[in-house]
Amino acid sequence: MGHSAVLLSVALVILPACVTGGPVQRQQQHKLLLVSFDGFRWNYDQDVETPNLDSMAQEGVKARYMTPAFVTMTSPCHFTLVTGKYIENHGVVHNMFYNTTNKVRLPYHATLGIQRWWDNGSIPIWITAQRQGLKTGSFFYPGGNVTYQGEAVTMSRKEGVLHNYKNETEWRANVDTVMKWFTEEDVSLVTLYFGEPDSTGHKYGPESQERKDMVKQVDRTVGYLRDSIKRHHLTDSLNLIITSDHGMTTVNKKASDLVEFHKFPNFTFRDIEFELLDYGPNGMLIPKEGMLEKVYSVLKDAHPRLHVYKKEDFPKTFHYANNPRITSLLMYSDLGYVIHGRVNVQFNSGEHGFDNQDMDMKTIFRAVGPSFKAGLEVEPFESVHVYELMCQLLGIVPEPNDGHPGVLQPMLRSGSPLSRQHHLVVVLMGILTGLAKVV
């Protein structure tokens, strides 16, 4: 056996032991808090005074903006953050659970508790960290209160159906609880979710005074959070990331702007076996047997602002359609236009779900802590890379994912610790790549 073949054999023996997910011995790692403020558009801090977000950027890292995954919905984008996968690869393709066979469709809050919707093959960072010896927590974060391959998050809280997302007093109480998890329960990773400014942006629109006032509340909460970190003596041991799932745009409401299926010439719902419409700018359809070509030909030019595709023709750049849960026809509309189905039931002033390349869908990224450089502004990046960064901060070996560990590496101070196991996997993967070319 040649020298290269021997090295390859050794690498193949060692590598599986490094990625089995079992507990590993590591140096003391810093803790990590990931905070998401739902629907915080990338430029919401430009028309409102945000002293706490500003000071966080001065003391840490700020991205010009972050590009979310498509489709720009809450649950799919949040799951991308904790799996590092594009939505077609992690399978949480919509805010709503749906079953195309029995026609069941469940709203967002009910879907949060549907285990099989989330546990469909991808392992989120909570479970990966726990399998490598850490405790984790999820406070209201989408996907954090179900089990994955039978394993639950160490500490978790889920909001109720009628939860008031605007209560600032409760926000502070939630921060207090998370601080206790870190200090009293020795949790290493927590994901903390706030439903604003998304709810306010939907109701009043992203350019409204109400949205601006809510951003001020968000900023006050960031200040309270950072003060809490200091009070609990976590400044030197806790890395903090503040981000979001997507942005928000103003809905066009003139009669000439409406995308209304029930008014399309030659279209009839009698040709449709399953529909998922009336959810912002996104839609899915399954025509009845033998009707696919007819329905497609009617819809593809039905409205200049509507883009209808057969599943196999959906733009690959979205990384969305290649999943068994995606229907035979799917569609999205241009920025500001929402899709109405049988009747008009959407009356939001603000909406998301649009093309993730539209600037109004971009969102924020801030980070501060012992592992991050100070006063650094980085170029825009995709949210799919955040998972690799978090694994690196925790010193854990990531699951297979679509991100790249080098993209966000420049944010980190030189000498920020990687676990030995993480280093070994990177080295061995390099060996395997090189040797595969010569063996």
Curated annotation (Swiss-Prot):
Active-site residue list: T74 (nucleophile)
> What post-translational modification does the entry describe?
N-glycosylated; required for activity and transport to the plasma membrane.
Task: Cite the pH-dependence comment.
Answer: Optimum pH is 7.5. Optimum pH is 9.
CDD domains, per database record: Enpp
| UniProt-listed Gene3D superfamilies | 3.30.1360.180, Alkaline Phosphatase, subunit A
In the UniProt record, the signal sequence range is 1-21
Q: Which GO terms describe its biological process?
A: fatty acid homeostasis; lipid digestion; negative regulation of cell population proliferation; negative regulation of DNA replication; positive regulation of ceramide biosynthetic process; positive regulation of intestinal cholesterol absorption; positive regulation of sphingomyelin catabolic process; regulation of intestinal lipid absorption
Entry keyword annotation includes Nucleotide-binding: no
Domain of life the protein comes from: Eukaryota
Can you tell me which residues bind Zn(2+) 1? D38, T74, D245, H246
Cofactors demanded by this protein: Zn(2+)
Belongs to which family?
A: Belongs to the nucleotide pyrophosphatase/phosphodiesterase family.
Q: What does this protein do?
A: Choline-specific phosphodiesterase that hydrolyzes sphingomyelin (SM) releasing the ceramide and phosphocholine and therefore is involved in sphingomyelin digestion, ceramide formation, and fatty acid (FA) absorption in the gastrointestinal tract. Also has phospholipase C activity and can also cleave phosphocholine from palmitoyl lyso-phosphatidylcholine and platelet-activating factor (PAF) leading to its inactivation. Does not have nucleotide pyrophosphatase activity.
Q: What is the protein's given name?
A: Ectonucleotide pyrophosphatase/phosphodiesterase family member 7
Originating organism: Rattus norvegicus
Organism classification: Eukaryota, Metazoa, Chordata, Craniata, Vertebrata
The coding gene here is: Enpp7
